[in-house]
Swiss-Prot record:
Transmembrane segments: none annotated. HAMAP family: Salvage_MtnA. The active site is at 238 (proton donor). This is Methylthioribose-1-phosphate isomerase. GO terms for biological process: L-methionine salvage from methylthioadenosine. Gene3D superfamilies: translation initiation factor eif-2b, domain 1 (1.20.120.420), Translation initiation factor eif-2b, domain 2 (3.40.50.10470). It is an enzyme of class 5 (isomerase). It comes from Nostoc sp. (strain PCC 7120 / SAG 25.82 / UTEX 2576). Catalyzes the interconversion of methylthioribose-1-phosphate (MTR-1-P) into methylthioribulose-1-phosphate (MTRu-1-P). Coiled coil: none annotated. It comes from the Bacteria. The gene is mtnA. Keywords: Amino-acid biosynthesis, Isomerase, Methionine biosynthesis.
Amino acid sequence: MIYPVIWQNNCVLLIDQTRLPNEYAVVEIHRSEDMARAIQTMIVRGAPAIGVAAAYGMYLGAREIETGERQEFLQELEKVAQLLRATRPTAVNLFWAISRMQKTAYKTLGTVAQIKENLLQTAQAINAEDLQTCQAIGDNGLAILPKTPEKLTLLTHCNAGALATAGYGTALGVVRSAWREGRLERLFADETRPRLQGAKLTTWECVQEGIPVTLITDNMAAHCMKQGLIHAVVVGADRIAANGDAANKIGTYSLAIVAKAHNVPFFVAAPVSTIDFELADGSQIPIEERNPVEIYQVGDTTLTPPGVKFYNPAFDVTPAELITAIITENGAFAPHVLTKSSQQAVV
């Protein structure tokens, strides 16, 4: 199994995902500032993995605070939280994990040393829980995949695999479960412009585990569906609004429209922590815009002439009506049940 975030020898070990697939490298993170930089530069990426990394980042920041006075410590810890919150605005798991760490700090009534110890334990719990969550998502997703006489061919976008979580994955968790049970023939993976997470990361994960994978460009999906090559689409999510609108890597919305046009089921796989019940719908989800160099430059080669303007949103929002079901660790739900009044049933 692939584990992108590991606590070991009093530091955090991150698989450097910017170097994959050509180089497997592990980065040691000792300070909260370094963790913030790792999240911002996408050394670690994927909403659940970012949440785990941010939790450890909170502990690293707490460890750096020298005061033994409780109130002063909590004030300094808030500065660490602000640093980490500023890294990636769309992934709600980041904010959820930071909030959980802060609650741990405020609820601990002992010494500052005890607060720090409890923060580490909470970060480790978030890590372990996410792994269990992803395995449950995989099995719940397997249960609602189309029943066909032949093995399934699935399509995914970006990377919602082990690299994007504590391990196993959300969308790729469903793929892994299908492969484990002998129900998967092949995975089709969108390359996912502009950062090519599908080409670089999803295919790498599949090769590591022997899962048959075919890479296609993003604009080939409609053709593949028309040819009858795809039984279902399974993607992850970085934030889901209360009405079921789901923000995921840019290009997901287009894929959902194409799937709807070809009567191909479209599933979103994500932990309950990704559902933001404070947002009524997807129009309220903040969309990160990244450096346009990701669009116009490959390596040291510039692809465009001078004078061209660029627009580089990292995410788009898929309307709930295009989503067949949202797969969580607690089961699969039609998007319309994810309302504030049904939060208890979902959570």
